[in-house]
């Protein structure tokens, strides 16, 4: 599948090595972020440059297509998650913080929206879910691998000393993930009912695996 995506969609779009939306397409589209969210990083550098360039990025997030005036929170949130997945932690965090201030506490409707002017800024629960996924799947890099197991890649921003997700309800359990900076490494702890079930000091951007024991 990855090879097929590269062969069909991989393209030089202007100055960017990224993806075309369809054969013959010559305009950047915000959905070029999707391969990044799937862990496909062949064209990560060019794709990130394109997404956050003035050709797509606006003060309200990503345009659906360069030259358009319509922006979609959905593609913006996918792009932020994809940026984390590609390891662009500082860029992703800067834009996530900007987006959060602009959309959630700025002079705007206080929630993630579908689109504008298309959709008239309506609130869909899917967009709020995608915002949460920027944190769970982007910042913490959580990916289920089974009914009682997952891998995760914490992306602790350079100016943060720690971060945590608490009361995560997944895999039939409730647990916490804590990430603490320890000089050049990260100490990562997973707790279930205050019992440590996983603890490791690891280099940054290192995938970690957790498997819960049977109840």
Language-model features, listed with the residues they occupy:
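Repeat-unit-sized solenoid/scaffold elements
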Residues: 1-13, 166-172, 177
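Non-catalytic C-terminal accessory modules of carbohydrate-active enzymes
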Residues: 85-215
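Extended glycan-interaction surfaces of carbohydrate-active proteins
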Residues: 2-73, 97-114, 185-187
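Well-ordered alpha-helical segments within folded domains of soluble proteins
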Residues: 26-39, 70-85, 125-138
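Short, flexible active-site loops
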Residues: 63-64, 78-80, 119
């Amino acid at each position: 599948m990855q090879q097929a995506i590269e062969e069909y969609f991989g393209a030089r779009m202007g100055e960017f090595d990224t993806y075309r939306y369809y054969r013959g397409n010559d305009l950047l589209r915000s959905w070029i972020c999707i391969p990044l969210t799937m862990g496909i990083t062949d064209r990560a550098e060019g794709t990130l440059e394109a997404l956050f360039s003035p050709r797509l990025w606006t003060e309200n997030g990503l345009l659906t297509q360069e030259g358009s005036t319509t922006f979609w929170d959905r593609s913006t949130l996918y792009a932020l998650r994809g940026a984390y997945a590609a390891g662009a932690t500082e860029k992703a965090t800067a834009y996530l913080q900007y987006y959060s201030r602009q959309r959630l506490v700025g002079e705007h409707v206080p929630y993630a929206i579908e689109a504008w002017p298309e959709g008239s800024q309506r609130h869909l629960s899917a967009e709020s879910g995608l915002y949460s996924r920027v944190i769970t799947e982007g910042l913490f890099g959580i990916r289920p691998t089974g009914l009682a197991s997952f891998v995760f890649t914490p992306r602790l921003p350079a100016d943060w000393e720690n971060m945590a997700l608490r009361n995560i309800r997944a895999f039939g359990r409730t647990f916490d993930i804590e990430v603490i900076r320890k000089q050049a490494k990260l100490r990562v702890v997973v707790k279930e009912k205050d019992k440590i079930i996983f603890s490791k000091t690891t280099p940054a951007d290192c995938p970690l695996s957790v498997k819960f024991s049977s109840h």
